[in-house]
């Protein structure tokens, strides 16, 4: 009986896994659930409101640009901001300069930023000399650093209904030229209603009511405007042998391809009919101008013109800006005010083939045409060696459009087409006001980060940067 008890005891121990067994013989431990890594860090880097700098111009300026660039030697991107002031007497004649302010945000190398205008610009109260409309980036002086050229004007809402009021919107073009520790502000050329600009090597080209071009030779600006006699007010692209111009004249609008200032090819849309139109800076004055209506992709739009272009290898990507009635149909010969319209922006694609402009039928799946914007980037944001499109849309809480709250529209290149990336879970700008944003690799880790800032410093001029943890399409 004693031996039977011992045998049963041994059997019980073996069946229960006791008696010096390894840990692998123990009862299974439930596996730990690891939450997926979020795309962006929870808390943003915040760049302080530069109110003590821009308030010398005005208290609630337009926040036109926040330009990412490298100024100091750490791994983080630095920023140059430009603010300019709206008219205090809109629609009235004014020939005073538009007040403005430049602000340089320098990284401290640890995710923080300080404003240092004195070291970067040589002045606490640095200015470009008016309202900036567009800028172009290049290396004009060949020092390996970014230089910037700005199309400038005094278009702040003042009147523009006759010759005298029109030329009161003119301003001189501006350059930010890099040097060892910062930037020198240079103004070149004649005052104009500057609207477009391109840098091509050591050459800088400006389009306005006239064309201007300059080349930096031995640290001296040389006027070469006679080589570029027809640069578009709206937008142009400069190639080695060609220029592509956005044009609207004689009831036609579209693109022209120029070689040695001669048009060799064009793609044009014919005006459907005319209406009488009161622009935003003439609101309430009763000053109407004739305006063309164009049928684009089966819809009638006011105006319609290519306003921005970029290159992706051989592909030319362009935006057509137009406007539509908020309600009803556009009637030939009718009277309309810009306040009755909503903006529309459509993408179009082109190539140069055998010296001819050819439109390419490339689809953007989920294209959002009702978000207004001026600027977009042609960059590879998901590291697949194909350039994508990032539209810096205006998020405006006062209109009827969906509010992106600072998040750009991101169109991912999938080879033969693009698709609208779902950004619904992305962080948004924290201030409940008009905002805008773009993508940039701020911390130089190879993935793109989300940069957001206001359209105007109505409530705050804070800048918010959400660093990414991974590729934006992972």
Language model region names:
Residues 14-15:
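C-terminal motif of bacterial Sec signal peptides marking the signal peptidase cleavage site
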Residues 84-90, 154-159, 249-252, 322-327, ...:
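Short glycine/acidic-enriched loop and turn motifs that connect beta-strands
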Residues 62-72, 82, 131-142, 151, ...:
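Beta-propeller blade termini
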Residues 372-378, 391-406:
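Loop/turn-rich, solvent-exposed surfaces of beta-rich toroidal or solenoidal domains
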Residues 2-10:
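Sec-dependent signal peptide recognition
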Residues 73-83, 142-152, 202-207, 241-247, ...:
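Acidic/hydrophobic-patterned starts of short beta strands in beta-sheet-rich repeat architectures
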Residues 29-62, 106-130, 172-197, 202-205, ...:
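Blade-edge motifs of beta-propeller repeat domains
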Residues 436-474:
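Blade-level signature of beta-propeller repeat domains, shared across WD40, Kelch, NHL, RCC1
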């Amino acid at each position: 009986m004693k031996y039977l008890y011992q045998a049963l005891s041994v059997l019980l121990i073996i069946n229960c896994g006791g008696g010096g067994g390894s840990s692998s013989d123990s009862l299974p431990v439930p596996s730990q659930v690891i939450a997926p890594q979020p795309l962006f860090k929870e808390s943003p880097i915040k760049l302080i409101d530069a109110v003590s700098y821009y308030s010398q111009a005005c208290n609630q300026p337009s926040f036109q640009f926040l330009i990412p660039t490298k100024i100091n030697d750490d791994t983080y991107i630095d920023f140059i901001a430009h603010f300019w002031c709206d008219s205090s007497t809109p629609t009235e004649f004014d020939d005073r300069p538009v007040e403005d302010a430049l602000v340089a945000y320098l990284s401290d190398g640890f995710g923080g930023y300080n404003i240092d205008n004195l070291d970067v610009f040589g002045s606490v109260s640095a200015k470009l000399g008016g309202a900036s409309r567009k800028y172009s980036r290049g290396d004009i002086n060949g020092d390996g650093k970014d230089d910037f050229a700005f199309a400038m004007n005094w278009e702040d809402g003042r009147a523009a209904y006759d010759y005298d009021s029109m030329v009161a919107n003119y301003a001189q073009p501006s350059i930010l030229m890099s040097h060892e520790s910062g930037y020198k502000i240079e103004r070149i050329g004649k005052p104009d209603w500057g609207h477009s600009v391109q840098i091509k090597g050591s050459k800088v080209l400006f389009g306005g009511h006239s064309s201007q071009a300059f080349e930096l030779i031995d640290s001296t600006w040389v006027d070469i405007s006679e080589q570029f006699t027809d640069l578009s007010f709206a937008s142009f692209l400069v190639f080695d042998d060609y220029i592509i111009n956005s044009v609207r004249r004689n009831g036609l609008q579209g693109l022209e391809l120029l070689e040695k200032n001669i048009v060799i090819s064009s793609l044009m849309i014919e005006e459907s009919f005319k209406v009488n139109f009161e622009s935003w800076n003439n609101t309430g004055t009763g000053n109407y101008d004739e305006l063309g209506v164009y049928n684009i992709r089966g819809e009638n739009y006011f105006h319609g013109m290519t306003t921005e272009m970029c290159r992706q290898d051989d592909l030319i990507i362009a935006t057509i800006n137009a406007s539509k009635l908020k309600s009803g149909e556009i009637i030939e010969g009718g009277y309309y005010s810009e306040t009755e319209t909503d903006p529309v922006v459509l993408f179009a694609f082109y190539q140069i083939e055998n010296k001819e402009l050819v439109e390419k039928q490339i689809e953007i799946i989920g294209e959002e045409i009702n978000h207004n914007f001026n600027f977009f980037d042609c960059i590879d944001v998901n590291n697949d060696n194909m350039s994508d499109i990032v539209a810096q849309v205006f998020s405006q809480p006062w209109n009827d459009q969906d509010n992106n709250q600072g998040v750009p529209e991101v169109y991912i290149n999938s080879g033969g087409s693009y698709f609208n990336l779902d950004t619904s879970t992305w962080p948004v700008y924290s201030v409940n006001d008009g905002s805008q944003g773009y993508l940039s690799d701020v911390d130089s880790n190879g993935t793109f980060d989300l940069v957001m800032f206001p359209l105007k410093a109505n409530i705050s001029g804070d800048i918010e940067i959400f660093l990414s943890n991974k590729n934006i399409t992972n």
